[in-house]
């Protein structure tokens, strides 16, 4: 089972479709791509928005998956 982590959006560029999340547990910032955002609306995140997510190892390092705004 995948562990859910909470964090705050450090920054997200809606034009480029990616950004970074700072986990609340103090671990290293995690890359997030718009395709990982679970939403029926336009997939974007706002700076300092609280989110819940899981982490998977991507081709360039850790990447957030199943991102849900709280």
Swiss-Prot record:
Residues covered by the CSD domain:
7-67
- Name the GO terms of the biological process aspect: regulation of gene expression
Question: A Gene Ontology CC term for this entry?
Answer: cytosol
Keywords of this protein's UniProt record, alphabetized?
Activator, Cytoplasm, DNA-binding, Stress response, Transcription, Transcription regulation
Q: Where in the cell is it found?
A: Cytoplasm
Disulphides: none
Q: What Pfam family is a match, any one?
A: CSD
One of the record's GO molecular function terms: nucleic acid binding
- CDD domains per UniProt: CSP_CDS (cd04458)
Report the PANTHER family cross-referenced here.
COLD SHOCK DOMAIN CONTAINING PROTEINS
User: What protein name does the entry list?
Assistant: Cold shock-like protein CspJ
This protein's species is Salmonella typhimurium (strain LT2 / SGSC1412 / ATCC 700720)
Q: What is the lineage of its organism?
A: Bacteria, Pseudomonadati, Pseudomonadota, Gammaproteobacteria, Enterobacterales
